[in-house]
Amino acid sequence: MVLCLCVSLVVACNPAPEEGTPNTPNTPEQPTEPEQPTQPEQDSRNELVAQKGYPSGVEVYYFKNYYEESSDDYCSGYYAIVDTKSNPKLKFNAVYVENDATPSNIFASFAGGTPLLATNGGYFWDGESLSLLISGGKVESIAAQYTYPSYEGKQYTACPRRAAFGVHADGTMEATWVYCCPDDNNRPYSFSSPKGNNEKVGVFTSTPHSSSSGKLWTPQEAIGGGPMLLKEGKNVAESNYWKEVLHSGGTAALTYQPRTAIGYTNDGKIILFVCDGRKMNGSSGYTLPEVADLLKGLGAVWAVNLDGGGSSVMVGKDGKALNSPSDGTQRRVPTAVVISMEN
């Protein structure tokens, strides 16, 4: 399948860090011969429409991309590029809600400045967050320490390291694998890989990861999900889907679904992405490797998948959903991402 995208930016890839040394964002060592992404063929039916009314440093686009020239199937959605360096008043906020709410309601009640955009956040079950969330330097929700995958008819216990995106106090951005270590009061530790599990072949680590093999992770704001979609510009979505033990949970990486994702570029721009699926507005959705390819084409070097399916929504500056959630209405969620501007 040829994936036709309305993007044209390219990005260099950086060398992989050694195990036990989490990546250091925004100051990567540059390779001598950077790999360049292969640009897909363009379909004349594709659409890319800039949304008006956002302040300097925020660009929001509607896209509609056909899968193949011979096909009438397509994916549509929205993405936003947020440049906090060009406009220092712009802020990334990870928001935790004790009594879950729709992203539009979270947007409306946001008190940390003027909200401009919001998306749903990490995974949850029965209103309880299953993903890491750090707000104002405080851990509001830890990442799931245990999950219970099935392989060949048998249920196992696994301790997954899962992807998260964070912004540090100095403004640097980082995507890494996180585990909240019981041997240090469940504080989040960063790891350079999801090492230890592979749901595809039935290999699982049931012993909690030790803080001694990671690095204490202390961003000011962070949202967790998984899997990691891009690592140093390389599409790692499919392999990490299995290694982060997300198949049994219903993430459905290799089928067309509504998706939400977040990434960042080498020069420190945040990219938020949401696509519709399940034929809402005719959109089939994307696989996770396709989302990774699109984000890479926009310049992202690291990217993290967030909760998708019926949860996927992007709220615009007027507080209303830009896309069309597949449930027909917005789901109530315990975590969200809000882009705001200081008053």
Locate predicted features.
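Active-site-adjacent helix-turn-beta-strand microarchitecture at beta-sheet edges
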Residues: 128-253
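Short glycine-rich loop/turn motifs
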Residues: 74-79, 162, 224-226, 256-261, ...
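Zymogen propeptides
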Residues: 14-22, 33-183
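Conserved, well-ordered active-site substructure
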Residues: 128-154, 240, 244-302, 306, ...
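Second-shell loop/turn segments in exported
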Residues: 92-97, 216, 277-281
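Short acidic-glycine loop/turn motifs at beta-strand connectors
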Residues: 83-86, 166-174, 230-233, 264-268, ...
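C-terminal motif of bacterial Sec signal peptides marking the signal peptidase cleavage site
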Residues: 9-12
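Sec-dependent N-terminal signal peptides
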Residues: 1-6
